């Protein structure tokens, strides 16, 4: 496996963890819809992140994670290992996608990962 790819994914995991902690602190994790919109707002503050790329990515979150696992976000505690659950859900979402959609998904995801690394508005 490409080392650069692995490093990018590791960085994304870190960003996702920090963002999740921040968002759950802000909205208490009790209303997934607000969680979704808060992420959208945070992403929109990043100049290298085109809005056209944010929408499809967040829709994966919204449809595959937030609507099915509201209780998880209500009880989120970064001190425990719920972060692993988020990654697991992302992988499950990817497994359920048709092959052509999956390829598009990973292309978009990699683009987003690189954008996240270039601008760090959420790693405070």
UniProtKB/Swiss-Prot annotation:
It comes from African swine fever virus (isolate Tick/South Africa/Pretoriuskop Pr4/1996) (ASFV). Belongs to the asfivirus H124R family. GO terms for cellular component: virion component. Induction: Expressed in the late phase of the viral replicative cycle. Keywords: Late protein, Virion. This is Uncharacterized protein H124R. Its main location: virion. It is found in: Virion.
